C-alpha cells in the first residue's frame, strides 16, 4: 500500500478563503495552500512550514478542520497512490499583507512550477473553482460552517 500525506491550510478572512493558483508539472491547479508531509514532521509542523515557505507568513492558532475519510487516488503519481489530506484552519497577523492577485494565474509564465495567491469569496463561489476533489469537499464544509 502506498500513501501520500498532504496538509493544507484554510485562511478565512472577511468572507473569503485564501487559495493558491499553481502550475504543477505543466498543469494549472487551484487549491488550498499546503503540501506534503516530510519525514520526521508532525502534521501541524508541516502546515506551519508550508505556509512559511509558500506565503512567507507565520500560521497562528492552527486548529484541525478535516481529515479525508474516503479513498482518493493521486493524480500526480504514475503508480497507484492513495491521498490522505489533513486540513487546518489558521490565522495570520495581517491577512491583507499577503500578496494576492485578482485574476487566476496572473503572472504565472514559463515551464517551471509556480504559484500565486488570491482570495476566493465563499458566498456565491463554486466548488468547481477548486481543482482537487478533496478540496471541493472541504469547500462545501467551509460554506456550511
Range-by-range predicted roles:
Residues 70-102, 137:
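Active-site-adjacent beta-strand/loop module that shapes the phosphate/pyrophosphate-binding cleft
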Residues 9, 64, 86-90:
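A structural signal for short, well-ordered beta-strand segments
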